C-alpha cells in the first residue's frame, strides 16, 4: 500500500505526463498520425530504452492523456486540502480542467466530445467550486491572496528573486560579442590579434 505522499506523488506524475504529452500531441498529432507516448507501466520487464511507439492517431494520444488525468484525479487531493506551502501543486480540479482542454482539442476530430467538455465544466463548477471571479478586480489585484480564487486552476508558481528576463545562465541575446553584459553568443570569430 502506498503512503499518502507516495500516492500524491504518483498522481502528480500521471498529471505531469499527461500534460507533457498533451503539449506534443496537439502540436504535432493529426487524425492520421499521433505522437510517441511512453507508458512505463506497459514495460513489464522494465524500460528497455527503445524508441517509444508512435500512436496511430492523435485521438489515441488523447485517450491516453485522458486516462492519465483520470489516474491523477484518483490520487490527488482537492485544492482546498492543500496547505499554503503546497499551493501550486496539481490537484483534482486541475486534472479535470486538463481533461476539458484535451476533449476540446479532440472535438476538432470528433464533435461528440463537446458533450464531455460541458459535463466536466459542470463538474468543475458544482463539485469543485471553480468558476468565474465575482468582480474584475479579483483578477488583477495586487493582493496575492486573491490569486487562489475560484478562477484558479493550476500554475507553476515562481519562487521570486528573478529579474524577469529569464534564465541568467544559458540565455542568448543578440549581441555581437562573446560573453558580455548580456551573455550573448554573438559571432565570436577568431582573429590574428
Walk through the language-model features, giving the residues of each.
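Aromatic-anchored glycine-rich loop motif in surface-exposed flexible loops
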Residues: 1-87, 106
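An aromatic- and glycine-enriched ligand-binding surface/loop that stacks and positions planar moieties
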Residues: 33-35, 62, 69-73, 89-193
